[in-house]
Amino acid sequence: MKFPRRLVFKLTALFTMASLHPGLTVSGNPIKGYPDEIQEIRYPVEADNSEQPALFWKPYQYSEKAPLLVALHTWSSDYLQAGGEAKYAEWCVQNNWIFIHPNFRGRNRTPESMGSDLVVADIRAAVEWAKENAAVDESRIYAIGVSGGGHATQLLAGRTPEIWAGISSWCGISDIAAWHEQTSAAGLERYAKDIEMALGGAPLPRSQEEKDAIHRSPLTWLGKASPVPLDINHGINDGRDGSVPFTHSLHAWNAIVPESEKLPAEFIKEFYATQKPSADDVPNDPLYGERQPLFRRAHKNTRVTIFDGGHEIVHLAALNWLAAQKKGQPANWNPPKVADLQTSDKDTQSGK
């Protein structure tokens, strides 16, 4: 009896994983919305002696060391989130990159989630597990995320800068307490309620919840992120058509760069109120397609871009930029297009 080639390939991969790691849980079930090759695995986290789930793929028929993409789900989802998240997996399969999509404690509404120490431990452990189970090129380990994943990527840039060759952050929340206030005022109570459930209450001034929110906020840690090539992106309509005002990314920029490069508070306030950037001429960036940059600043390894869009990611720009980064080298702000990726508006706007 002959079996379909794709089935044979997947079964071979599963048997290989199981034989190398007998105690490892590997699911052979298809992952809805993902390429057939993607597997569900569980990996150990020493911080609380737990096993955490993730999606994983490695190029089994590719002997050379390969880049590792750590893709991070959005605020209200988990490691099984498809849509735009599955596009990261497609890129990896097409380009022989290693892919891991950790749960990092799931939806951001529990004390264990939302930028906790366990979140950081989970992602660090996911990287270590991938290195033990695949031929990872340690000079090309990347992180990517939008919305809640953007929050996590910024947090990682400050808390684990030694890991990354490049981090692509889109529409991230840089200040948990500020976002609680903003979502409450904007009638987006479900996000404010998520924050309160994670903290145990509202992050009111001088409260323990505020202290916890500060600990979970990228702004607290981004001062240590300058060695990491970090590309911060945000749509100019976010905060109106989306849930995260683009001011979060401008404040993230300010937290990293020296005083001479910081954006004045009055400029940030006026920019958000008017949606009119400075008169600076921003060159066309072909990787952004119809979502062209409207405002851009770069300083050494850090860049911030406000683009013509909303609460979304431009996969082609993000992934081609990451492909040009290598650990120990200065950020490459003029990346070539090394590969294409077909996406729809539904994919780019999946980050909620």
Regions found by a protein language model. Name each.
Residues 26-63:
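N-terminal cap/lid segment of alpha/beta-hydrolase-fold proteins
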Residues 62-66, 71-112, 176-177, 240-242:
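Short substrate-entry loop that stabilizes the transition state in hydrolases
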Residues 76-81, 165-166, 172-173, 177-223, ...:
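Mobile cap/lid helix-loop segments that gate and shape the active-site cleft of serine hydrolases
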Residues 114-134:
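Alpha/beta-hydrolase active-site loop
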Residues 131-133, 138-187:
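Primarily recognizes the serine-hydrolase "nucleophile elbow" in alpha/beta-hydrolase
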Residues 195, 236-299:
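Active-site-adjacent alpha-helix of alpha/beta-hydrolase-fold enzymes
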Residues 232-234:
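Short beta-strand/loop motif that positions the catalytic acidic residue
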Residues 296-351:
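Catalytic active-site module of serine/aspartate enzymes centered on a nucleophile-bearing elbow/loop
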